[in-house]
């Protein structure tokens, strides 16, 4: 291979390596290796060497460094990367490469950086040999707020959990967080062991049951329920999270155990509808849950509805699930009262649902202008077109559709509205002034072109635009219309 190197000039080999982005070519012999200081490939050669366990390459570079009579560019290049050895320590703690960690330590890596986080990664991934090595290097068992059992529980290594507890690690830190993480990742045997050791399944308002339900671990849910007798099903969101994530069997199990379907006025069926889980919705409907128009109050942002008059069908519309909407209509859900679903579909950009609702006989006259306003505010051009073509008034509410489009910076919608009769001078030239405030030169030029009055721009407007830092539009006004700050 040495002879091959000399078949071409160095400059050609550099171009070949740069073009192919193939670092391995540099490792074929020392002649090619010396090109390392000349190439411009994206890959970090030092990183490539370490991650592939080419320690003999590092030994070679180390020997070059010892030769004080000559300067080798590759030595300097490798030295640039030795200040970041700890990130490779973390990688090897995760992948379980103890020998590589030892080599990094011999090169000067500090395994205790960032409050012994390397220890956590080794524990999380179940590498006992690395754990013991790090402890021998002074790592603190109680660093990072004594979270080692949490890490082992998260990673699912029962033997590591047992060992840590046997040497005094806290398995109940932060209100039984290790138990919750074991529930989250589905490690039933660790859950059982922690409970046997004294972990409380009721901690954090039954968060372990809620977490297992959310993640779909039916076996863990059953085990936890069997270990508690005081669940307040009136306020337990386990079934709601199970419904949200399409875990039908868990929903059924929790209902059989007494879960309250009317929690927060029916958020269980709402989250199932919003996320498109038709089987769960059908199951809940079979139990008699109301789907009509009703007042609900949900005191948590988890389910996206707060203090609104909301029919369940609105949740299906919000999620864009046409089949769910059709199902609700087929079993009698109201879609005509206040046209709530229609406006909701316009807000969330679901044109096919709008067309379906129209086909089912809703009256466009009632809420079409409101639907137009919300569609403009959200940037849904195709819905705006559909509504205008079906009678929506682009001048409604003193030109509010255009104002909403301007505020959202939706120039395509603004152009469409203007082409259909919207007045760019309405509401004290709001369209132009909003474009100026946002600093959008293209939009400013467009509104002036179609008739916005630049003479309505006051000195106060200019000062406000200046405070906002819109220098480009200010310069345009000055150079084109001689309008400038006084």
Curated annotation (Swiss-Prot):
Keywords carried by this UniProt record: ANK repeat, Repeat
Top-level division of the source organism's lineage: Viruses
One Pfam family matching this protein: Ank_2
Recorded coiled-coil stretches: none
Repeat region (ANK), residues: 84-113, 114-143, 145-173, 174-203, 205-233, 234-263, 265-293, 307-336, 337-366, 367-396, 398-426, 427-456
Stretch forming the signal peptide: none
InterPro entries: Ankyrin_rpt, Ankyrin_rpt-contain_sf
Name by which UniProt lists this protein: Putative ankyrin repeat protein R634
């Amino acid at each position: 291979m040495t002879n091959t190197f000399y078949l071409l000039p160095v400059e050609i080999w550099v171009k070949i390596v740069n073009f192919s982005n193939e670092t391995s070519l540099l490792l074929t012999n020392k002649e090619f290796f010396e090109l390392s200081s000349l190439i411009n490939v994206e890959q970090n050669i030092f990183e490539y060497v370490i991650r592939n366990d080419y320690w003999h390459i590092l030994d070679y570079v180390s020997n070059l460094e010892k030769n004080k009579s000559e300067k080798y560019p590759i030595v300097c290049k490798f030295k640039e990367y030795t200040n970041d050895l700890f990130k490779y320590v973390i990688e090897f703690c995760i992948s379980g490469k103890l020998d590589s960690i030892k080599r990094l330590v011999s090169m000067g890596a500090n395994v205790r950086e960032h409050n012994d986080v390397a220890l956590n990664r080794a524990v999380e991934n179940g590498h006992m040999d690395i754990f013991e090595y790090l402890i021998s290097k002074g790592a603190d068992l109680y660093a990072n707020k004594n979270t080692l059992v949490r890490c082992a529980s998260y990673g699912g290594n029962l033997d590591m959990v047992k060992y840590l507890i046997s040497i005094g690690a806290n398995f109940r830190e932060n209100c039984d967080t290790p138990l919750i993480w074991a529930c989250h990742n589905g490690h039933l045997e660790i859950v059982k062991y922690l409970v046997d050791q004294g972990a409380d399944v009721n901690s954090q308002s039954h968060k372990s049951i809620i977490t297992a339900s959310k993640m779909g671990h039916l076996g863990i849910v059953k085990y936890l329920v069997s270990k508690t007798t005081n669940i307040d099903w009136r306020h337990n969101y386990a079934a709601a999270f199970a419904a949200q994530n399409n875990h039908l069997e868990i929903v059924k199990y929790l209902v059989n155990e007494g879960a309250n379907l009317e929690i927060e006025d029916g958020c269980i069926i709402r989250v199932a509808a919003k996320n498109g889980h038709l089987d769960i919705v059908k199951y809940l409907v079979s139990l008699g849950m109301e789907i009509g128009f009703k007042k609900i109050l949900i005191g948590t942002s988890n389910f996206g509805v707060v203090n609104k008059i909301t029919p369940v069908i609105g949740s299906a519309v919000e999620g864009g699930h046409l089949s769910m909407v059709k199902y609700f209509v087929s079993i009698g859900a109201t879609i005509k009262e206040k046209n709530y679903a229609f406006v909701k579909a316009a807000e969330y950009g679901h044109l096919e649902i709008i067309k379906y609702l129209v086909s089912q006989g809703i009256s466009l006259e009632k809420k079409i202008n409101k639907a137009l306003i919300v569609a403009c505010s959200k940037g849904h051009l195709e819905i705006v077109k559909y509504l205008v073509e079906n009678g929506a008034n682009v001048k409604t509410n003193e030109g509010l559709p255009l104002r909403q489009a301007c505020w959202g910076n939706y120039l395509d919608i603004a152009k469409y509205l203007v082409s259909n009769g919207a007045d760019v001078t309405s509401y004290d030239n709001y369209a132009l002034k909003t474009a100026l405030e946002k600093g959008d030169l293209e939009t400013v030029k467009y509104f002036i072109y179609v008739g916005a009055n630049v003479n309505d721009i006051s000195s106060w407007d200019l000062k406000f635009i200046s405070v906002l830092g819109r220098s480009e539009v200010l310069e345009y006004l000055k150079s084109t219309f001689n309008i400038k700050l006084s």
